[in-house]
A protein has these predicted regions:
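TRNA-binding/sensing appendages of the translation machinery
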Residues: 1-119
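Positively charged, Gly/Ser-enriched RNA/tRNA-binding surfaces
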Residues: 64-94, 101, 113-210, 216-217, ...
Length: 370
């Protein structure tokens, strides 16, 4: 439905069907031409005062983080991610990409007048690259996993309540795309590769002026969390309307307000889950991955967190979050990721799997300098 602004503009211009025309009746190519000419006409009368006003917006301000520090992070990350092919993404993607794949509200995306949009999530663009490559592999009967990584500056238009968050920021992301081979083998193998990358990255950065201590690795499973919520009488729609991914502590507040307690820290899903809730793939993850990682990284902590609600409508299956101790004594969830159905949808093949994870470069450079 059109907003009050649309209704007011329609009334003032005397064009009653303005919104339906813009929303779908005009072809995208025609609307692109229309908007291009409109903005060209407007900017023809712009001057220095207009530039000064525009330059006050946080959207166009430069990052407050030293560029050399960001580049140092990127160099280290690319060195550690030597098993992943490094790609340089376009700063824009197809119109609707962030919403269709990432579930980002279109109002929170910087949409261009040329029927494209600025990246709001690097993993959606990487998913499209995986789709291209997996599509070609299918023609050639190829079955190799596609492993990609990138560093990307993103733009998100939503208001941020947390100090330190800005409309544009840099992330380093990894994706692994391949075929389900049964027995959760894809999830176990590639989740392990991603976790190892981040823990090794933190170690490497510790030698370069950063301080990451006792990283807490939390594994969750959306299927288990959905079952627990259902048993508590909470619908997914109610949860999705209340939880915002960029607001810290959202899960805790949502559950506390409803008097619901979900298992936040468990070690053995088969023994510790409530009766009637199947562990799905978590039991295999414990024996085939988590127990090995505990021996490999004795300074890190590992647990299953089934009280995590952020990402429940974003991921499909196993997801992870890593929160190292920062120099200020707090833990911040700097790494997030999980399994998605994006390549399965794009390739129209339910056996396709995509693991997408990322680390907040800019946030790390602010909070984790020694």
């Amino acid at each position: 439905m059109p907003s009050n602004i649309i209704e007011r503009v329609s009334t003032e211009t005397g064009i009653p069907r303005l919104f339906p025309a813009l929303a779908g009746e005009i072809a995208l190519s025609d609307m692109q031409s229309l908007l291009m000419h409109a903005y060209k006409s407007r900017t023809a009368n712009f001057g220095e005062s207009d530039l000064r006003r525009g330059a006050e917006r946080s959207l166009v301000a430069s990052s407050k983080v030293n560029a050399r520090l960001l580049n140092q992070f990127d160099r280290t990350a690319y060195e550690v991610a030597n098993e992943f092919e490094a790609v340089e993404l376009s700063p824009v993607g197809p119109l609707g990409m962030n919403h269709i794949l990432g579930g980002i509200d279109q109002n929170n995306v910087l949409t261009t007048i040329r029927n494209a949009e600025v990246l709001g999530d690097p993993t959606t663009a990487l998913a499209l690259e995986c789709w291209r490559r997996r599509k070609n592999q299918a023609r050639d009967a190829g079955r190799e996993t596609v492993r990609l990584c990138c560093s990307q500056r993103l733009v998100r238009m939503q208001p941020f309540d947390e100090p330190g968050y800005t409309p544009h920021f840099r992330l380093f992301a990894l994706v692994s795309a391949g075929r389900d081979t049964g027995s959760h083998a894809f999830e176990i193998r590639h989740l392990g590769e991603h976790i190892r990358f981040y823990l090794r990255l933190f170690t490497a950065l510790n030698d370069r002026g950063f301080s990451f201590r006792q990283p807490l690795v939390e594994i969750s499973d959306t299927a288990v969390v959905e079952a627990l919520l259902g048993a508590s009488g909470i619908g997914l729609q109610e949860m999705r309307q209340s939880i915002r991914a960029h607001v810290l502590g959202g899960s805790e507040r949502f559950l506390a307000e409803r008097g619901v307690r979900l298992p936040e820290a468990i070690d053995d899903p088969e023994r510790e889950l409530p009766a009637g809730i199947p562990p799905f793939r978590l039991a295999r993850l414990k024996t085939e991955l988590i127990d090995k990682l505990r021996r490999e990284f004795p300074d890190a902590q590992f647990r299953f967190n089934l009280a995590r609600l952020e990402g429940l409508s974003y991921y499909r299956g196993v997801c992870l979050r890593i929160s190292p101790m920062a120099p200020d004594g707090n833990r911040y969830p700097v790494t997030d990721g999980g399994l998605t159905d994006w390549t399965a949808r794009l390739l129209e093949n339910r056996k396709e799997r995509l693991l997408a994870t990322g680390v907040g470069t800019e946030f790390v450079c602010v909070k984790y300098r020694a």
